[in-house]
């Protein structure tokens, strides 16, 4: 009897396409950001958190780019450095850092715009000005609309 698919007999495991393997990168980023905030506390300038977080992520073996140009093209015009993203980790996750008392909707929209312009899917808005960083983390996924804002 012949088998048309891979199975346990040939040592291959089948994967469930509905359950993708979780990406550990976001967890490493958040754990590192939480540690930086615990060590430094709130109240410093955004630039300090950017430098320290980039360094800590690099020490964990991740590729980190700082102040990454966000290009814009419009009707033949090319703006190569119209904006700058604070950090891009592993060429796939954008980090926008703030050190403010409270973030506003415009900050979230900024991250979403950067994701679109850079062709990335996942970003985090990290507010190091929050007393507890866990309260200052916003995960932003391009194309995801939170249930509370969907039309019914």
Cite the ranges covered by each PLM segment.
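A short acidic/basic microdomain associated with nuclease active sites
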Residues: 58-75
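Nuclease catalytic cores
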Residues: 22-27, 42-46, 50, 54
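Active-site beta-strand-loop-beta-strand hairpin of nuclease catalytic cores
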Residues: 78-80, 84-95
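A short, surface-exposed helix-loop junction/capping segment
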Residues: 29-38
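Acidic pyrophosphate-coordinating catalytic loop
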Residues: 74-80, 133-134
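Intrinsic disorder/low-complexity segments
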Residues: 1-21, 145-152
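Nucleic-acid nuclease catalytic cores
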Residues: 94, 98-151
């Amino acid at each position: 009897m012949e088998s048309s698919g891979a199975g346990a007999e040939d040592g291959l495991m089948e994967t469930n396409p509905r359950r993708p393997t979780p990406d550990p990168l976001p967890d490493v980023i958040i754990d590192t950001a939480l540690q930086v905030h615990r060590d430094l506390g709130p109240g410093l300038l955004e630039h300090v958190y950017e430098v320290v977080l980039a360094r800590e992520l690099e020490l964990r073996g991740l590729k980190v780019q700082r102040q990454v140009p966000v290009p814009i093209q419009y009707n033949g015009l090319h703006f190569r450095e119209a904006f700058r993203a604070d950090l891009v980790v592993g060429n796939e996750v954008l980090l926008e850092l703030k050190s403010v008392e409270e973030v506003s909707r415009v900050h979230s929209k900024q991250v979403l715009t950067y994701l679109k312009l850079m062709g990335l899917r996942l970003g985090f808005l990290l507010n190091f000005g929050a007393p507890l960083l866990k309260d200052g983390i916003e995960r932003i996924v391009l194309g995801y609309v939170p249930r509370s804002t969907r039309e019914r």
